[in-house]
Amino acid sequence: MPAYFQRPENALKRANEFLEVGKKQPALDVLYDVMKSKKHRTWQKIHEPIMLKYLELCVDLRKSHLAKEGLYQYKNICQQVNIKSLEDVVRAYLKLAEEKTEAAKEESQQMVLDIEDLDNIQTPESVLLSAVSGEDTQDRTDRLLLTPWVKFLWESYRQCLDLLRNNSRVERLYHDIAQQAFKFCLQYTRKAEFRKLCDNLRMHLSQIQRHHNQSTAINLNNPESQSMHLETRLVQLDSAISMELWQEAFKAVEDIHGLFSLSKKPPKPQLMANYYNKVSTVFWKSGNALFHASTLHRLYHLSREMRKNLTQEEMQRMSTRVLLATLSIPITPERTDIARLLDMDGIIVEKQRRLATLLGLQAPPTRIGLINDMVRFSVLQYVVPEVKDLYNWLEVEFNPLKLCERVTKVLNWVREQPEKEPELQQYVPQLQNNTILRLLQQVAQIYQSIEFSRLTSLVPFVDAFQLERAIVDAARHCDLQVRIDHTSRTLSFGSDLNYATREDAPVGPHLQSMPSEQIRNQLTAMSSVLAKALEVIRPAHILQEKEEQHQLAVNAYLKNSRKEHQRILARRQTIEERKERLESLNIQREKEELEQREAELQKVRKAEEERLRQEAKEREKERILQEHEQIKKKTVRERLEQIKKTELGAKAFKDIDIEDLEELDPDFIMAKQVEQLEKEKKELQERLKNQEKKIDYFERAKRLEEIPLIKSAYEEQRVKDMDLWEQQEEERITTMQLEREKALEHKNRMSRMLEDRDLFVMRLKAARQSVYEEKLKQFEERLAEERHSRLEDRKRQRKEERKITYYREKEEEEQRRAEEQMLKEREERERAERAKREEELREYQERVKKLEEVERKKRQRELEIEERERRREEERRLGDDPLSRKDSRWGDRDSEGTWRKGPEADSEWRRGPPEKEWRRETRDDERPHRRDEDRLRRLGGDDEERESSLRPDDDRIPRRGLDDDRGPRRGPDEDRFSRRGTDDDRPSWRNADDDRPPRRIGDDDRGSWRHTDDDRPPRRGLDDERGSWRTADEDRGPRRGMDDDRGPRRGGADDERSSWRNADDDRGPRRGMDDDRGPRRGLDDDRGPWRNAAEDRISRRGADDDRGPWRNMDDDRVPRRGDDARPGPWRPFVKPGGWREKEKAREESWGPPRESRPSEEREWDRDKEKDRDNQDREENDKDLERDRDRERDGDREDRFRRPRDEGGWRRGPAEESSSWRDSSRRDDRDREDRRRDRDDRRDLRDLRDRRDLRDDRDRRGPPLRSEREEASSWRRTDDRKDDRTEERDPPRRVPPPALSRDREREREREGEKEKASWRAEKDRESLRRTKNETDEDGWTTVRR
C-alpha cells in the first residue's frame, strides 16, 4: 500500500491518464491500491466505475489473481449496501473474459484445444512429442493465442463461483455463472475442467449444509433455491451427456436425487419429466436397458397424470417408445458365470437397489414386471399400429417360422422414421437379439435337430457368424439345451436328459416342455392328473353342498349390500375430513416452523453480527501485523527483483529458490551481491591478464592479412557498381523517352477539348456570380452586426476591468499604509528597547567603576591591616617567656584535645580523599552554583549596586580570572547532578587549607560578631530577601567529611537522623542547640569573628546548605594553618594563653610535634569559653541541661585521655576531650584587638569577593566542555599552596608537598571504612534534592 492517501475519484482519473499513454500496469496498480485501502470500506457510487476499469485492466493483462482479490474486496464493500452492483461487476467481468476468448478463437484456426488440463498445460509427454514431431507455425500460434485466454476464462469462472458460494443474496448469479461454466466446458470440450467444476459445485453444496447458521446462508428448504440447484444440476447432467462423460452424469443424477430428498415438497412435474428423460439417456448409455425402460415407464405415467393437454400424437410416441424399450430389455440375465462364481450377488443387488432409489422405486424392476405393468396400464392401446403387434409376436404367440419375418417388418418401419422418431433407432439391435433368442427357444420345443442353413433362412436380418454367436450366448445364459455339430452343420436340442434349468431362466411362449424337464417334472404332472381324476369321480352331494353355500353367500350379499354401500360412503367422507384436518394441521405446523425459523435466524443474525464485530477487531490487529510483515516482504521482494533483473544478480541468486529469498535479510542479499561482484571482477581480471599477451599479436596478424583482400574486394565492388549504374542509367533514359512520347499523344488528343472547356467554365462562373454576390452581401451585414456587438462587449468589459483595477489598487494602498504603520511602530519599539539596553549597559559600567574604586580603597586598607598584624605578631613573639612555655606543655596537650581542630597546615582531614577523574567531574558541576550564592551573601544586603550585578536577568556571560582554577558555572536550566558524585565522600568543597568551621544551621539566632559599639551598617538587613538555596524547612547542618571532628549539626529537637558519633567517641561536650559562637581560630584566620548572642540575623546560608565554609574557592591567599608554629618573617603579636594558641595546639595534635603554647594563652581561652557557655545557658534552659551532660562526658574522657605520641605523625581517632572550660578570661584590651583584627579581615575578604566577581564577569566567557572537563577547582592542596605563595606579597613557608601527599594517602586508606556506612544515604538524599537545568549557553543550575 502506498504511504499517501488517494481519493477514489483521483485514482480513477490517474488510471485514465496512464491508459492514455499506454501504461496499463501502473494504472492497474493505482486502482489496486484504492481497492485494498482500508480508507474505502464504505460503498460509494464511484466504486463501481473504478471496479469496472480495474477488471478491464485485469482482463487485458490476464491478471486473474488480481481480479480475484479485487472482487473479494468489492464484495466486502458492497455486500451490505448494494448487492446489485456486485452482480453487475461480476457479469461485466465474465463478459469481457468471454469476448477476449472468442476473439482469440477467431484468430486461431484451432477450434478445439488438445490440452487435457489447463492447470497443467506443459506435460512431459507433450514436450517430448513436440520435440520429436516438430511444431509448425500455426500450431505454435494457436497455442500462444487461444490457450492462455481459455485458461484465463476458466479461472475467471472458478474464482467467481468461489466468490459467490453460499450467499443467498447472489444465489441467482451463482447458478447463472455455473451454467455458463458448463457451456464453456461443452464449447471447448474441456473434460478435465468439467470434472473439476462438478467437484467444486458438489463441495459448495456440502458447505451449504454445514454452514447453514450463517446470516447469508442458503436455505435448501426454500423452493426457489431448490429449483435453481436442480436446474443447475440438470444443466450439468445434460452437459455430461453431451460430452459423453457418463461417470460424471451418473454423479449428477445422484446429486439431483439428493436434492429431491432434502426437499419436503415434491418437485415440479416439468422438472421431474426433464430429470427422467436425462436419466433414461444415462441408463441407456451405460448399457442398463432394464432401468432405462423403467425410467421411461415413470416418465410415461408422470406425463399421463400431470399433463392435462397431452395430445394423441405425443401419447402414441411415448407409448411406442415405452413398448420398444420394454421389449428391448435383454432376455438373457445380466449376471455372468464369473459373477456367479465370485459370488457377486450381493454387489449386484446393492447396485440395483441404488439405481431403483434414484427412480423412487421400492424394489429393483424386472422385465416381466415391466411387461405386466405395460399390459395392466393399457399402454398397448396407444401404440402406433405398425408396432402394436410386436408385443404379441415376441411375448404371446408361438410361431417360430414366421416370427423373424414379422419382426423384420416392424424393424424396417422403425428404420424408416429417423426424422420423426430418432430416439427409436437405438432399440433395433436389442430387438434383433431378443427375436433370435425367442426363435431358438421355440425351435428347441419343436425340433430335436435342425440344419444350420435352415435356421439361417429363418433369421434373415443376421449372418451366420452373428447367429452362431447368439446361439452360444443363449446356451450359456438362457439355459438353452442346444449342441452344435460342425461336421454335419446341424443343431441338436434336448439331448441331455440330466440337465436341470435354473429358477431364473427366461420365460416366453410355451408349447411343450423339453425332455429333461418332463423327466424332472414327472411327479408334478402325475399329481395334477390325479387331482383332475378326483374331480371327475367326486359324488353329487358334494356338488350340491357347494351350490348351497354359493347361494347363501349371494343372499347375504344382497341383504347387506346397501348397508355396506353406506359404510363405504361414510368411510370416504371420513377420509376426506381427515385429509382436510391433516392439511390444516400441516399449514399450521408450517406456519409455526416458519416463525420458529425466523426467530432462529434473528438470533443467529445477532450472534453473527457480534461475532463479526469481534472478528473485525481481531482482523484489524492481525492486519496491522500483516502490514508490517508485508511491507518488509515487499521491500525485500522489490530489492530482489531489482537485483535479479541485472546480470550480476541473476548469477548471484541462481542457486537460491524464491521462497528462500523471501526469508533472507536485505543485508545478506547485499552481501551476496557484493560477493558475486567481487568474484566476477577477479575472474575478469584473470581473463584479461591471460588474453592481453596474445590479443595484440593476433589482431595485428589479422589486419595484415586483411589488407590485400580488402583492396581486391573493393576493386571488384567498384567495377560491379559502375556496370550497375550504367545499366540503370540506360533504363532511365529509355523510360523517359517512352513517357514523353505518351505525353505528346495525350496533349494532341486533349487540345481539341480546350475551347469547350473554356466555354463551360465561363458559363458556370456567370451562373454562380449572382449567388456569390448575394451571399457576400449577407456576410457583410452579419459582419457589421457582429463587429458592433463585439465592440459594445469590449467596451463594457474594459469598463468593468477599470473599476476592478481601481478598487484593487485602493485596497492595496490601504494595506500598504497599514503595513508601513506597523513597521514604523515596530521600529519605534526596537529603538526604545535598544535605548533601554544602552542605558542599562551604561548604568552597569558605572557600577563597575564604583566597585573598582571601592576595591582600590579596600586593597590599600588591606595592606595596612597586614602590616599591623605583622607588627603585633613580632611584639607577641618578643613577649613570649621560654620558662612559661616550657611549663605549659601539659596544658598544651590538654588544649590539643579540643573538640574542634584548629588550622593545621599539613593536616589532610579538610582536604578529603584523593581526587579521581569521575569525582572531579561531578564536583565541577556543583561548584559554580554555590560560589555564586556565596557571593550574593557576601556582598551585603543594602548595597543595591552589588546586588544588581548578580541578578539572574543579567544576560551577560560571566567571566572569571585567568588564575581561577574552578570549574565552569552552571546555567539556571542545566539539569546535571551535583558535581559531587553519588559516591563522593569528601567532607566539604572548601580548600584543603581552609581551617574555618562551617556555618551554623537555620536556628542560629546568635548576635552579631561585631562589637556592640560598632556603628557600621549590617552586612544584610533583616528583610534581606536573598535567602539560601536551601529550603526553609530543611534543618540539616552543613555536610562534613569523614575526617571532620566537629560536633553534630545543630537542629531542632525533631531531627530524626541518628548521630554519626561512634560509641567510642571521646570528644568534648557538644554545645547547646542555640550556640551561635564560632570555632576557636588562630590569629591568622581571615574570616569574620564569631557572632555574639544578641545577633539574630539569618545564617548567610540556608538551613539546608551542605557545602563547606563560605571561604571563596579561588581565594588566592596563602594557607595560614600552621604558620604560628613555624618560624617566619611575620607573626601577629598576642599575649600568651589566647584562643589562637589553643587552636594551634589543636592542630599540633594532628600533625608533627612542635613546641607547646604558653599556659597563659590556654587560661585565657578557658575564660573565654566559659563566658560563651554562660550566655548559652541564659538563652535556652532546655539545651543547657543537654550541654552539661555532654560536658561531663567530655571531661571524663579528657581525664583518661592518653598523652599524644610526640615521636611522629599520627591520625587522631575519635575526638579527644577539650579543656576549653579550664581556660581563663583575658582582659578587655585583648578582646578589642581581636575584634578589630576580625573586622579588618572581613573587609579584606569582602573586597576580594567583589574583585573575583568582577573578574568573572569581565574575563570569563561561556563555559566550554573542555573547560568543564579539565578546569577543576578541586586542586591538590600542595599545588594551590604553591600558586598562592607566588601571588602573595609576604612570603610564607609551606609544608613539604611530599609529606602532604603521604598523609593524604594514609588518611584515605583509614577513612574508607568509616565513610562507607553513611555515604549511600547521603548520596541518595543528594540525588533526590538535585535537579539540573541547562540553558542555551551551556550554563548549568542545580535546583534543590
From Swiss-Prot:
Report whether Cytoplasm shows up as a keyword of the record: yes
Q: Report TM segments.
A: none
Region forming the signal peptide: none
Q: Where is this region: Disordered?
A: 807-844, 866-1240, 1252-1344
Q: What is its main location?
A: cytoplasm
Map out region (21 X 10 AA approximate tandem repeats of [DA]-[DE]-[ED]-R-[PLIGFSV]-[RPS]-[RW]-[RL]-[GNIHT]-[DGLPTAM]) in residue numbers. Answer: 924-1133
List residues, modification Phosphoserine: 492, 584, 895, 949, 1028, 1149, 1159, 1223, 1300, 1326
What does the record note on quaternary structure? Interacts with KRT7. Component of the eukaryotic translation initiation factor 3 (eIF-3) complex, which is composed of 13 subunits: EIF3A, EIF3B, EIF3C, EIF3D, EIF3E, EIF3F, EIF3G, EIF3H, EIF3I, EIF3J, EIF3K, EIF3L and EIF3M. The eIF-3 complex appears to include 3 stable modules: module A is composed of EIF3A, EIF3B, EIF3G and EIF3I; module B is composed of EIF3F, EIF3H, and EIF3M; and module C is composed of EIF3C, EIF3D, EIF3E, EIF3L and EIF3K. EIF3C of module C binds EIF3B of module A and EIF3H of module B, thereby linking the three modules.
* Protein known as: Eukaryotic translation initiation factor 3 subunit A
State the organism of origin: Mus musculus
